[in-house]
Regions:
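N-terminal capping/small domains of soluble enzymes
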Residues: 1-78, 163
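Glycine-rich tight-turn/loop motif centered on a GG-T
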Residues: 30, 73-98, 176-179, 231-247
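Catalytic alpha/beta core domains of metabolic enzymes, predominantly
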Residues: 177-323
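C-terminal extensions of enzymes
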Residues: 317-388
């Protein structure tokens, strides 16, 4: 964080599991590291003094929300049972939705201190619209409005589909904070930047209160390289791609988007998620997703598993500003021979209707939808146990 005053670190999971996770980490720690680790974890987030946290915000998604159920099943079961008492004729889909909203509300409440102390600059928690409706503009808007009403520090996660950018523009025009997710390629990232800018202009023209408004644009970095067609197309073209080359491909997209957003005066902030401890070179582990982007006015959002890996593999790593350093020309030239990357790297590489069928988006949306169904199944079992 010392590499840029605007650099932020967020918690990529529900705040409701932080104590469980940190407690489990301490139980596994070697005795000689226990004191140091306890201080590190308290510095990241202290439930007694959340306003002093190193974490300045929170991102969640369906798989991460499902983790809350797995980590605190009896706790969530009680929430579900209480909601059934209040809504006796509810069906399983409606019960899932009110349960999800309650998890979002409680998590946001844990960061209200950060939100208020920072004068509404930090302390946002991202609540996501149902990934199963990523092409339904009206349903996404309806869900977004419900989520936004839960707490002033709830930021709405909206997918990078063609319809999603229409939703982002609308929400921005109403002064509602957004986080663009399921985003992998430059055409998506810039479509979001433009939608936010246009929506903000409408909001200002209409005198909308923007006191609690903020926008971030997420790049699901390693998901671009790992879930799509990058390696397959390279292999078919007989182009040898190393692990480092794949990481450079992801970084090239992020760095270019960052430059365009910063130089274009767009009101959004770039956020990186889906980071990996990678590459491994000459037996040494690196995390280029952290190292090569250090010095940027950006957000890094880190899930529990990634934080554990950083503690284990990167202890003592010194960071220096590298955000403005270019991708090596030989690597970029090789990558640009691959259509999957070439389209991802150019602002007009994909038309908006092509966003919905991008391989990384389809794979991620499928995974997130399956996790959502997992939450529905959980509440359905509680419903069946009560109603027979």
């Amino acid at each position: 964080m010392e590499t840029h005053p605007g650099l932020e670190i967020w918690w990529d999971s529900s705040p409701l599991i932080y104590s469980n996770w940190s407690g489990g980490l301490l139980k596994k720690a070697a005795p000689d590291r226990l004191g140091e680790l306890r201080e590190q974890l308290k510095r990241l987030y202290d439930p007694e003094h959340p306003e002093m946290a190193l974490f300045r915000g929170v991102t969640t998604n369906p798989p991460l929300s499902l983790q809350v159920i797995k980590a605190r099943e009896s706790f969530v079961a009680q929430i579900v049972d209480d909601l059934m008492e209040k809504n006796p004729c509810i069906d399983k889909e409606a019960l899932f939705w009110v349960t999800y909203k309650e998890i979002v509300r409680r998590g946001a409440e844990m960061y209200l201190g950060v939100f208020q102390r920072s004068q509404y600059r930090y302390g946002y928690l991202s609540g996501q619209v149902d990934p199963r409706v990523l092409t339904d503009k009206e349903k996404m808007i309806a869900q977004a409005l419900e989520l936004a009403s839960l707490s002033p520090n709830v930021m709405i996660k909206v997918p990078g589909s063609k319809q999603g950018y229409e939703v982002i523009k609308f929400l921005t025009s109403k002064g509602i904070s957004t986080n663009n997710t399921l985003t992998f390629v430059l055409p998506q990232l810039m479509a979001c930047a433009k939608a936010v800018k246009e929506g903000l202009e409408i909001a200002k023209q209409n005198g909308v209160d923007l006191t609690h408004w903020r926008s971030v644009i997420t790049h699901m970095t390693a998901r671009y390289g790992d879930l799509g067609d990058l390696r397959r197309e390279a292999e078919s073209l007989k182009i040898d791609l190393s692990e480092a080359d794949v990481r450079w491909a992801e970084l090239a997209i992020f760095k270019k988007a960052y430059r365009l957003v910063e130089k274009g005066g767009y009101p959004s902030k770039m956020l990186i998620c889906s980071m990996r401890i990678s590459p491994i070179m000459n037996g040494k582990k690196y995390c280029w997703h952290l190292e090569k982007l250090a010095g940027g006015n950006i957000v890094f959002t880190c899930p529990p598993s990634f934080i554990e890996a950083v503690f284990e593999s990167l202890d003592g790593t010194e960071f220096r500003p590298q955000i403005d350093e270019e991708v090596p020309k030989t690597v970029l030239d090789k990558l640009l021979r691959i259509p999957y990357f070439e389209k991802a790297y150019h602002e007009d590489g994909l038309a908006p209707h092509e966003f919905n069928t991008h391989p990384a988006l389809v794979a991620t949306a499928t995974e997130f939808s399956k996790a959502t169904e997992g939450m529905v199944d959980f509440v359905a079992k509680r419903l069946a146990a009560k109603c027979g």
